[in-house]
C-alpha cells in the first residue's frame, strides 16, 4: 500500500481538523506512503486516473454510496470510516481509525465484493443510466394515489401491481428501505436481487427474491402520471411518459476493504436490529 486516496465529507470537517489527523496517523504508520486528498466536487475522474491502492471515504452511508457509484468501474477498493449518523455500511468508526490503519499496513484486511444495480430508460431522445449500491425505488412522489405497473423478469410476465411503488434492492440495500417496507435481510455477499412492493393491494404481493442475473422490466405506467425513481435515496428523477424501465445487475462489483476482525452480524445486530443508542451518532 503506497498510494492512498482520501475524501472527507466537508460538512463533517469544516475546519480541516479531521484531515490533519488522518494525514498524521497515516504518515506515522508509514512515512513513504503517498496520501492524496480529493475535494467533494468532481473528484472521481481524478481518482480513477491516479489509481490509488485504496480509497478512504469519511462520512455517513451517503458518502459511501456516492463513492461506490462513481468508483465501481475503476475497481478501486473503498475503506469507509463513519463520521456520520448511523454508518451501517462503514468498515469502522472514526475512533478506531488509528488502530485500523495499523492493521491495514500489517495486511490484516480482506476485500469484499458487493452486487450493484444498473437502471436505464429512454426519455425523449436520450438514454438515462444510473448505478446503485442500495436500491432503485419507483414511486408517485408526494401524491397520495396508487400506482399501477407491470413487472417482467427475463422477458416473462411476473405480475401487475397496484401499490405506492416498488423497491428493487441489492443484498447491501436489503437493510435499508427494503427492510422498512417488510422485505427480508439478505446476506451482503450473495448475488441476488429483491423486489418489494410498497403497501401493495392484493391477496399476496410480498417480496420476491431473484437470481442476480435476472433482468427486470417495469412497464404499463400511465403516461400521464407523475412518477419518479430514486437511486440510493438521491434526488428524484422524473420518469413521466417513460414506457420501460430496465433494471439489472451491473457488470462491475463494488469492492470494499474490510478488516479481518470485521463482524457483519455484530454490526447488523447493533445498528439495524437493536438500534442501540451508542450507534445512533448525533441526535436529529
Curated annotation (Swiss-Prot):
The gene is nadK. This is NAD kinase. Gene3D superfamilies: Probable inorganic polyphosphate/atp-NAD kinase, domain 1 (3.40.50.10330), Probable inorganic polyphosphate/atp-NAD kinase, domain 2 (2.60.200.30). The active site is at residue 61. HAMAP family: NAD_kinase. It catalyses: NAD(+) + ATP = ADP + NADP(+) + H(+). The keyword Nucleotide-binding applies. One of its GO terms (biological process) is NADP biosynthetic process. Signal peptide: none annotated.
Amino acid at each position: 500500500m503506497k498510494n492512498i486516496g482520501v475524501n472527507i465529507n466537508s460538512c463533517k470537517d469544516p475546519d480541516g481538523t479531521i484531515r490533519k489527523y488522518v494525514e498524521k496517523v497515516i504518515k506515522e504508520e508509514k512515512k513513504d506512503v503517498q496520501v492524496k486528498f480529493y475535494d467533494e466536487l468532481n473528484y472521481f475522474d481524478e481518482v480513477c486516473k491516479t489509481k490509488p491502492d485504496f480509497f478512504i471515504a469519511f462520512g455517513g452511508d451517503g458518502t459511501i454510496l456516492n463513492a461506490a457509484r462513481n468508483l465501481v468501474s475503476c475497481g478501486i477498493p473503498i475503506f469507509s470510516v463513519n463520521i456520520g449518523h448511523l454508518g451501517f455500511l462503514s468498515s469502522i468508526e472514526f475512533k478506531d481509525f488509528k488502530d485500523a490503519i495499523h492493521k491495514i499496513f500489517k495486511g490484516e484486511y480482506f476485500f469484499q465484493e458487493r452486487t450493484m444495480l444498473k437502471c436505464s430508460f429512454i426519455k425523449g431522445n436520450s438514454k438515462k443510466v444510473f448505478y446503485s449500491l442500495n436500491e432503485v425505488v419507483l414511486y408517485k412522489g408526494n401524491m397520495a394515489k396508487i400506482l399501477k405497473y407491470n413487472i417482467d423478469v427475463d422477458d416473462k410476465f411476473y405480475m401487475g401491481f397496484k401499490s405506492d411503488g416498488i423497491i428493487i434492492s441489492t443484498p447491501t440495500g436489503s437493510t435499508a428501505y427494503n427492510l422498512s417496507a417488510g422485505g427480508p435481510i439478505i446476506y451482503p455477499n450473495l448475488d441476488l436481487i429483491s423486489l418489494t412492493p410498497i403497501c401493495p393491494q392484493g391477496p399476496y404481493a410480498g417480496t420476491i427474491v431473484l437470481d442476480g442475473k435476472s433482468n427486470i422490466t417495469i412497464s404499463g405506467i400511465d403516461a400521464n402520471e407523475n412518477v419518479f425513481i430514486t437511486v440510493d435515496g438521491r434526488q428524484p428523477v422524473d420518469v413521466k411518459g417513460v414506457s420501460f424501465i430496465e433494471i439489472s445487475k451491473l457488470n462491475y462489483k463494488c469492492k470494499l476493504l474490510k478488516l479481518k476482525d470485521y463482524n457483519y452480524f455484530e454490526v447488523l445486530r447493533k445498528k439495524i436490529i437493536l438500534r442501540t443508542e451508542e450507534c445512533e451518532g448525533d441526535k436529529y
